[in-house]
A protein has these predicted regions:
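Transmembrane-helix signature of polytopic, membrane-embedded enzymes
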Residues: 16, 98-120, 139
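Membrane-proximal, lumen/periplasm-facing interface regions of secretory-pathway glyco-
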Residues: 37, 321-329, 352-411, 418-434, ...
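Membrane-interface alpha helices of multi-pass inner-membrane proteins
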Residues: 53, 160-177, 189, 212-215
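Transmembrane-helix motifs of polytopic, lipid-linked glycan transferases
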Residues: 85-106, 143-147
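Specific aromatic-rich, kink-prone transmembrane helix
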Residues: 95-97, 136-155, 162-170, 336-339
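Short helix- or helix-capping micro-motifs
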Residues: 114-122, 170, 174, 188
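Short acidic/glycine- and proline-prone juxtamembrane loop motifs at membrane-interface regions
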Residues: 126-137
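Transmembrane-lumen/periplasm boundary regions of multi-pass, lipid-linked membrane glycan transferases
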Residues: 172, 184-297, 302, 309-314, ...
């Protein structure tokens, strides 16, 4: 009987992985069809540039997501589709964490519906395509919650191992983004709402987790000390010196309803106990939408686990402690769908009856996403959307070709200039080229300096945007001044590049200015 149950549970798990994998692959395919470039802010190129070195920090963010990017592209080719695959593998790991959390909380019947509902939320679909410091938390926070819950509940060797996992995963979350401190504060507060959680504090387990957490962060803390707390200075610049930005507070307050609108509406529509008629379901819908967010008493662990990251962030923003940013809301909703279903379901049967329907809808949704993507690509092409036509690949090819023509006996080793758009040369061109922010001997490049840069061939790249709508930038002037100060020629090299191929019916030229750095030979 035990063997039969094991086989059954394994089959269920593989089925869940298959469904979530289908979600991931459909979005990878859709983004690969609809988009001709990675994100317009070059965040993903920035990750790639940081990931070229294994460092314990940077001038902007802690390092873990850059490590992940670097390891990924040491295995996979530097193409957009591979990047989207990383993004949605991250989503799949997060949804599996939500599934496991539901099981840990004794809500196994809600596990699959909760995961399937979340895949319709924007952070797990459209926004998830951009892999960065915010989106990596989608895969980390649920597993931290799982480890915490088992550390509280399990005794003996299992409890010790889960406590080690809690400390390790918490350290990884902090090494991904310091904003995880808000989530960990929420975990600490949640532990006090139940008798089991309070008892946990008088056992050695939380202190073991804290020890592992500290050891995991120690190399990063040492790096910070050696680099004049540079990352913390960047964080402090995000503070609220100018007072509370109530517009951002209001936007962040609405984030749960905005980012998770579709699954919220759907869960309140589908889970209507008693199998009511269509009109009964419709008239009771507003009441169920409100019920989704309600606690079941002050000791409701699930409610506080789901809501505290959002609430704590909101308090920090309202008090002016930080200036809120809407993308911070991306990871906060990992427990929302589980909370909704728990509140709406009068009995497990109420949810189990909707699971088959959700599976069918999910498959249909995945098919729809893929079918819509060619239309969206055509629409962007027809409208002449600037980001659709940015010729990153073609620019990398032309820039490398031009360098070889100008400097046939000198290998290009590094590229500086406009961060992080300059990383296109390494990502789409030659992965051996080191990307530096700005110029190699000034901040922020000096935080993780490139050895012997002055003895190597380098290029300074300044994208100027489309010819008909050039961007306003002082990049060329800054690069010329730096070259002159280093005894180099500051003669600009102008380049016009356009995206090529059947996907680009319009010819929209983009301007680039480059400068060569040639080592001075004795």
């Amino acid at each position: 009987l035990d063997d039969k149950n094991t086989v059954t549970s394994q089959g269920v798990f593989y089925g869940v992985v298959g469904l979530l994998g289908l979600h991931a692959l459909s979005w990878v395919l859709a983004h690969s069809i609809a988009n001709t470039n990675l994100d317009s802010y070059a965040d993903m190129l920035e990750n790639y540039a940081w990931g070229q070195k294994f460092a314990w920090g940077s001038a902007k963010h802690p390092p873990f997501f850059a490590w992940v990017t670097g390891i990924w592209f040491s295995i996979f080719p530097t193409v957009d589709t591979a990047y989207y695959l990383l993004s949605f593998l991250n989503v799949t790991l997060g949804l599996l964490g939500v599934y496991r959390l539901a099981q840990a909380l004794g809500l196994s019947s809600l596990a699959l519906p909760a995961a399937l509902l979340l895949r319709m939320a924007f952070p797990y679909s459209t926004l998830a395509a951009k892999f960065n410091a915010n989106s990596i938390l989608l895969s980390l926070w649920p597993w931290v919650a799982v480890a915490w819950w088992y550390s509280v509940r399990e005794a003996g060797r299992s409890g010790w191992l889960w406590s080690v996992a809690l400390g390790l995963l918490s350290a990884v979350a902090m090494l991904s983004k310091y904003y995880s401190g808000v989530f960990l504060l929420g975990i600490f507060l949640v532990a006090w709402v139940s008798h089991e959680g309070r008892h946990w504090f008088v056992t050695p387990k939380p202190w073991l987790a804290l020890l592992v957490f500290g050891l995991g962060l120690l190399p990063h803390l040492q790096w910070l000390q050696a680099h004049d707390l540079v990352t913390l200075r960047y964080i402090s610049e995000q503070g609220g010196d100018s007072g509370t930005d109530w517009r951002q507070v209001f936007k962040f307050a609405l984030a749960p309803m905005a980012y998770w609108l579709l699954p919220w509406l759907l869960s309140a529509w589908l889970v209507a106990p008693g199998q009511p008629s269509f009109m009964q379901r419709l008239t009771g819908w507003p009441q169920r939408l409100v019920r989704c967010w309600l606690p079941q008493g002050w000791d409701d662990t699930l409610f506080w686990l789901a809501m505290l990251p959002w609430l704590i962030t909101l308090v920090f923003g309202a008090t002016g402690f930080v200036q809120l940013s809407l993308p911070w809301a991306i990871p906060v909703g990992f427990g929302f769908s589980l909370l909704w279903l728990r509140n709406l379901a009068a009995a497990p049967a109420d949810v189990s009856q909707i699971a088959p329907r959700l599976r069918r809808w999910m498959i249909g949704w995945c098919i729809l996403v893929v079918l819509v993507s060619p239309w969206y690509a055509w629409y962007q092409a027809k409208q002449g959307a600037t980001h659709f036509y940015v010729p990153r690949r073609e620019a990398a090819t032309e820039l490398l070709k031009g360098w070889e023509e100008r400097q046939p006996d000198l290998r290009l080793r590094w590229v500086g200039g406009a961060w992080a758009e300059n990383a296109l040369l390494a990502f789409y061109g030659d992965a051996s080229i080191q990307v530096v922010p700005g110029v190699p001997d000034q901040f922020p490049a000096s935080v993780s300096p490139l050895a012997d840069w002055h003895q190597q061939g380098g290029m300074l790249l300044c994208p100027l945007g489309p010819l008909d709508k050039p961007v306003q930038t002082d990049c060329p002037q800054q690069m010329q001044a730096w070259l002159q100060a280093h005894g180099q020629s500051s003669e600009p090299i102008h380049l016009t590049v356009a995206s090529q191929g059947w996907r680009f019916p319009k010819r929209i030229g983009f301007a680039y200015v480059v400068f060569d750095y040639v080592p001075i030979r004795p």
